[in-house]
UniProtKB/Swiss-Prot annotation:
Protein name, as recorded: Achacin
Binding partners and assembly: Homodimer.
Reported function: Antibacterial glycoprotein.
Transmembrane intervals: none
InterPro entries in alphabetical order: Amino_oxidase, FAD/NAD-bd_sf, Flavin_monoamine_oxidase
Tissue: Collar tissue.
UniProt keywords, alphabetically: Antibiotic, Antimicrobial, Cleavage on pair of basic residues, Glycoprotein, Signal
Sugar-bearing residue positions: 112, 150, 308, 392
Record family assignment: To A.kurodai aplysianin-A.
Organism of provenance: Lissachatina fulica
Length: 531
């Protein structure tokens, strides 16, 4: 594997300096006439695309924002069910940090949006239980009690902070909070940088197999432990900066990209938003403009299909605010270069899913269950459960019955692919099948200590699987061997002789890839340099 280390990065920059030769020659296209021309075309109406359009709104330029589907928001996706109309069901991003996510907070104020506490945070003491190897444990028991893992004497003595203990043994780091610059400089005993090791390699150096399994049970999902993931990714998640004040938006997380798009459109009649367009190819004309070839699409019940109708648009500059999983399919020659492809290869997309179910009552908090909890984290395929409160309109209660990732998402997606739908299921891509419902309630009955027959049937349900085009995952993680801070500079401008820029969360920072803030940070990085 070609590692993106410091030397290679410097070499890449030398190769790309303006005025020097480049092997990435643009395709020149003649013939087809543009249906219209704009100063800037922004492709993708998720957080990074709508924020880009918002920042350009008063620059005296003609800007058009394009979106593949019929929905603004990307991986922020607030939905509703008829029997709990006042509950925002967050099928994508659902929370943000009050202080750490600074751009998000500023935009909330600028756009006059309101926020509120995200009640459960990441699982609070006294409200959260863990279900591992058939045993239900409180947070306190997981950190200091008898756990169903055969930990060594050393591991047992450091049970409350086993990840920190392992990192100290690996690298000598003994700080309270691990920062990104610190993590990228850490070395292990054989002289390698920590980011060059997979999490399995790192933990196998200092821990027992049972200790590693215990950490998996303590983690949020499976993301940090999939094959090939960088050890830095894991230790930053577990030991990086954490904030207790966690918020969500009163009108749902989709309200932010929608408000950004609305403000953009209202600022000038020359701006436009065009939904249901897939960018097929990008090339340069003889007069120096960029020709964007779009295919018209149609969206029905969450499924988007392509037509054979083209829409040709010319632009002076292009901002590609689309996920890498869609970007790699774009016909644009600079994306085929070895350096850019190696940068693309630096991250893995994580398939994720959420399944919401509603019930007449919040049975998971009732006296009928042995292990009541507002949040459950488990090694079972449902991964995580969150209480989602009760409707003030109907009194019906909602839960995230499953918040899963990786193989657990694929397992559930297969169950949800065919068969009868539950009563009250959302249609199309957001359906919930009887098979999926039965599997999840069977798992939850074990975690809560209640007979499956004593759990009432759900009144409605909706699901979202982030696993197919254009989103092959809800977030990305860094692979071992790649320096995250160098890689992002290559992705944001794949060709230094072109005014084509890439924004989005997939390659930003070393740990923020799962947050909307990272999408905003990528926009700030690009605009500071090029706009």
């Amino acid at each position: 594997m070609l590692l993106l280390n410091s030397a290679l990065f410097i070499l890449c920059l030398v190769c790309w300096l303006p005025g020097t030769s480049s092997s990435r020659v643009l395709t020149r296209r003649e013939g087809p006439q543009c249906s219209r021309s704009v100063d800037v075309a922004v492709v993708g109406a998720g957080p990074s695309g709508t924020y880009s359009a918002y920042k350009l709104r008063n620059k005296g330029q003609t800007v058009e924002l394009f979106e593949y589907s019929n929905r603004i928001g990307g991986r922020l996706f607030t939905t509703h069910l008829p029997n709990v109309p006042d509950l925002n069901l967050e099928s994508g991003g659902m929370r943000y940090f009050k202080n750490h996510h600074k751009i998000f907070g500023v935009l909330v104020k600028e756009l006059n949006l309101s926020n509120k506490e995200f009640t459960e945070g990441f699982g609070k003491p006294g409200r959260t239980r863990f279900f591992a190897r058939g045993k239900s444990l409180t947070l306190e028991e997981m950190t200091s009690g008898d756990v169903p893992y055969n930990l060594s004497t050393e591991e047992k003595a450091n049970q409350a902070n086993l990840a920190g203990y392992y990192l100290k043994k690996l690298t000598g780091f003994d700080g309270e909070v691990l920062t990104i610059p610190q993590a990228n400089k850490l070395e292990v005993d054989d002289g390698r940088k920590l980011y060059q090791l997979t999490v399995d390699e790192a933990l196998d150096k200092v821990g027992t197999p049972e200790g590693k399994e215990f950490l998996k049970a303590f983690s949020t999902g499976n993301t940090e432990f999939i094959e090939g993931v960088s050890a830095v990714n894991y230790f930053l998640v577990e030991l990086g900066e954490r904030e207790e004040e966690i918020l969500t938006l009163t009108d749902g997380m989709s309200a932010l990209p929608q408000a950004l798009a609305d403000a953009f459109l209202k600022s000038s009649t020359s701006h436009a938003l065009t939904l249901n367009r897939k960018l097929q190819s990008l090339s340069k004309t003889d007069n120096g403009l960029y020709l964007l070839e779009f295919l018209e699409t149609n969206t029905h019940e969450g499924y988007t299909e392509e037509s054979n109708i083209t829409d040709l648009v010319c632009a002076r500059k292009v901002i590609l605010a689309i996920p890498q999983s869609a970007l790699i399919h774009l016909d644009w020659k600079p994306l085929r270069s070895e350096t850019v492809n190696e940068a693309f290869n630096a991250v893995k997309f994580i398939p994720t899913s959420k399944v919401f179910l509603t019930f007449p009552t919040a049975w998971w908090l009732s006296d009928a269950v042995k292990n009541p909890a507002f949040v459950v984290k488990s090694t079972s395929p449902f991964n995580q459960m969150y209480d989602w409160k009760s409707s003030n309109v109907t009194g019906d209660a909602a839960m995230i019955a499953s918040y899963a990732d990786t193989s657990d998402t694929k397992f559930q997606e297969n169950l949800n692919s065919k068969g009868e739908l539950i009563p009250g299921s959302a249609p199309g891509a957001n359906r919930v099948t009887v098979a999926l419902k039965e599997e999840l309630l069977s798992q939850l009955s074990q975690a809560y200590g209640i007979e499956r027959s004593d759990i009432p049937e759900p009144k409605s349900g909706t699901s979202q699987f982030w696993s197919s085009y254009p989103f092959e995952g809800d977030w990305t993680v860094w692979k071992a061997g790649y320096h995250c801070e160098y890689t992002q500079y290559i992705i944001e401008r794949p060709s230094l002789i072109d005014d084509v820029f890439v924004v989005g969360s997939d390659h930003v920072n070393c740990i923020e890839n799962a947050w909307t803030e990272s999408a905003f940070l990528s926009v700030e990085n690009v605009f500071e340099k090029y706009f």
